[in-house]
Amino acid sequence: NLDAVDVDGAVNFAADVTYADGADIITASAGTSNFRAGVNAGNSIASGGNYNVAVGDEAGTAISTGDNSVAVGYAALSAVSSNSGNTAVGKDALRLTTGSQNTAIGHAAMELNVNGSYSVAIGDFALYNQNPATATNTYNVGIGKDAGISVTTGVQNTYVGGLAGDAVVDGTNNVGIGFEALSADHGSGETAVGVRALKVSVADNNTAVGLNALTANTTGASNVAVGKDALDANTTASYNVSVGAASLTDNTTGDHNTAIGSDSLANNTTAANNTAVGSSSLTANTTGASNTAVGRSALAANTTGSNHTAVGKDALLVSTAAGYNTAIGDSVLKANTTGNYNTGVGASALAANTTGDYNTVLGYQAGDSLTTSSGNVAIGYQALATETAYAENTAIGYQALKTNSGGYYNVAVGHEALLSNTTAQSNTGIGNDALRANTTGANNTAVGRLALTANTTANNNTAIGAEALDTNTTGGGNSAVGYAALYANTTASNNTAMGLNALKANTTGAGNV
């Protein structure tokens, strides 16, 4: 065993080992397994190079002629000749490579690597100015401290932490991942994952995922951002989509928006073709545009209007300042303010809409105490149940004009038709129980089934078919026309009847024909 040796001058111990004066162990060079250790370390290994390792001082000083390299300290792989496997570990690491399968690990890592190759660098200055202009294949990665420190000139990129893509020059397929992520990148495929994510991107096909996501991205492009502050004040917009947390947080300036959860279109500015899907959905979107919102608080106090559609939960929940509305389920136009071209559809439909306009509603509680009215039409179940404050009514099925209160140009079409409408006006009935015990009269017309079914309290009647003036009460201008015509009309007035049972046992008299 050789524990310690005091060498004065260079001494050759065997054909392949030299102790140099003032140096660490140095194996003889020339071919095959190679290992060297200090001062001029790999000092131009030749005879085909081979499995190299050189360790300190000027380390791989122009290894010739390549092979599986590793160099460890000081000037590490000092301008390798003729390429091969590279790996370098410290100080100036892959100092001016030129090329092949690189990996570098610390201090200046890929220090100004000449003509790239398959790259990876891990710490300190990481991909420190990698610079292909030919001989490329540069698949870059980065990993720590200054990670992609101004990659020149781009290619496949991936950076991981520290300042990640720190001022990338010049882009390509990027990914970012941590701390300042794609910090001032020069575009291309982009994707960044955490902390400052796409901080401050110089665009292309963005995607960012967490914390400040698209942090003030400039200038827009195809965006998607997923969490925390998502499209955090993205500038200047493009095709947005955002997914959670504060979603389109104060996005500036607009474009094709879509946001999906949490605060969704949270105060989006300045609008464009919105869609939002859940949680607080279009939360106080500013300023309007083509909206659609789908769940939870849907168009939650949208400001300022535009072409709405909302679909569930609180739907048009206190919309401000309206637009072409349509809402479809749950609380539908829930106390919409201020009106416009409304349409309802289900659950509580036009639930106390305020303030009116061209309404149309379809089911469940239909015109559910619509306020304050306008063009109305309602279609099913409780139809115009119980209208407030009147206007041009039309209702179509089941309880139709169910005790409409305040009347007006009424028409109702089926089943209970004008079911006890109050307080009348220009009525028309049409089917099933038609003017069923209408109250209080007016210019009536009813058409089929029980027609003027015990209309109360009369006015200018006309009936037409089925049981026609079926025990009309109380009189009026009467006319009847078919089937049971003036069927036991009570209590008379100016009668005329025409077919089948015409004045059928008319009671009690009056103008007859």
Model-derived features with residue positions:
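Fibrous stalk/shaft segments of extracellular and virion attachment machinery
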Residues: 1-20
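Glycine- and small/polar-enriched repetitive beta-structure motifs of secreted/surface proteins
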Residues: 16-513
